[in-house]
Design a protein with these regions (language model features):
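P-loop/Walker-type NTP enzyme "switch/lid" segment
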Residues: 1, 51, 55, 101-104
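Single conserved hydrophobic/aromatic residue that forms the stacking wall/gate
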Residues: 1-9, 13
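Proline-centered helix-kink/hinge sites
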Residues: 5-7, 26-29, 102, 107
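Short, solvent-exposed loop/helix junctions and linker helices
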Residues: 6, 34, 69, 114-118
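Conserved catalytic-core segment of NTP-binding enzymes
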Residues: 10-96
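Nucleotide phosphate-binding site architecture
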Residues: 93, 99, 109
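C-terminal boundary of histidine-terminating zinc-finger modules
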Residues: 102-119
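C-terminal alpha-helix
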Residues: 123-132
Length: 133
């Protein structure tokens, strides 16, 4: 289930982590995303220590990547230095079709399967399956 920090890190979020085996942490390639990450990691450690000792970070996903921006590259390098092999190789690039899809009530693959954004998520799916299998 998608549980973004904007939805709160309260009791519901902690319960969801307690019932999970692994989490995937999406991080936007923006400066302030790194600040929110510390709060998420604190909650993760709290749940792992007291409620679900088997909880692991299944992967870290970089989103809204823009190869034209130095900031995107810097954020990826910062995250890579901390998470190392947990960082997915797949990057989710900033893509207009990904932004449009929710306003049409559709996931990216149903909205435009040929878009680069949809292809990024298909690549991520393959990478996740390789890690799990």
């Amino acid at each position: 289930r998608d549980c973004t920090p904007s939805r709160g890190l309260g009791d519901v979020y902690k319960r969801q982590l307690t019932c999970s085996h692994a989490i995937i942490i999406p991080i936007q390639c923006e400066y302030y995303a790194l600040e929110g990450l510390s709060q998420l990691l604190n909650t993760f450690r709290l749940v792992q220590r007291h409620l679900n000792k088997k909880l692991v970070i299944g992967g870290v996903l970089m989103t809204m990547y823009d190869s034209r921006l130095n900031l995107s590259k810097q954020v990826v390098e910062e995250v890579k230095s901390y998470f190392k092999d947990k960082l997915f190789k797949t990057l989710i690039y900033r893509n207009v079709k990904l932004s449009e899809a929710p306003s049409f009530g559709k996931p990216a693959l149903l909205y435009d399967a040929s878009s680069n954004g949809a292809k990024n998520y298909l690549s991520l799916t393959e990478e996740i399956l390789q890690r799990v299998i």
